[in-house]
């Protein structure tokens, strides 16, 4: 997905997800991008249309045993977490360059959370 297509999807409020190489063989890793206006918990009533888009970017790794065992994965099972809010599209695109080859999709597949 090109940068422009990524931004177009996010501007519609669509979260995007993608798997990335993990740091160890026992782990799997993902990136999730969650667009929002206001705070990560949502806008105040009545001002959603005037607020700029911001982007919560979560990167984490999960032990394969949780995924392959088809267990529910909870926050406490996440390892090597990064959780940041990007205030602009330029910041977001710069952040995404940390993961070359990241293939984002609006279909989470086996995204565990």
Give names to the regions the model predicted.
Residues 1-39:
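Negatively charged, low-complexity tracts enriched in Asp/Glu with abundant Ser/Thr
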Residues 2-3, 64-113:
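Mixed-charge, Lys/Arg-enriched low-complexity segments
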Residues 7, 11-13, 28-30, 56-61, ...:
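Small/flexible residues
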Residues 10, 23, 27, 48-49, ...:
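Short linear sequence motifs
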Residues 34-74:
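A short, structured beta-strand/loop element
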């Amino acid at each position: 997905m090109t940068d422009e297509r990524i931004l177009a999807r996010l501007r519609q409020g669509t979260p995007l997800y993608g798997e990335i190489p993990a740091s160890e063989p026992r782990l799997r890793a993902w990136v999730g991008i969650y667009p929002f206006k206001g705070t990560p918990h949502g806008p105040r009533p009545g001002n959603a249309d005037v607020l700029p888009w911001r982007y919560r970017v979560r990167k984490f790794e999960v032990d394969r045993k949780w995924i392959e065992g088809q267990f529910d994965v909870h926050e406490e099972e996440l390892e090597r977490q990064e959780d940041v809010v990007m205030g602009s599209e330029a910041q977001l695109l710069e952040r995404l360059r940390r993961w070359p080859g990241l293939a984002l999709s609006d279909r989470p597949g086996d995204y565990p959370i």
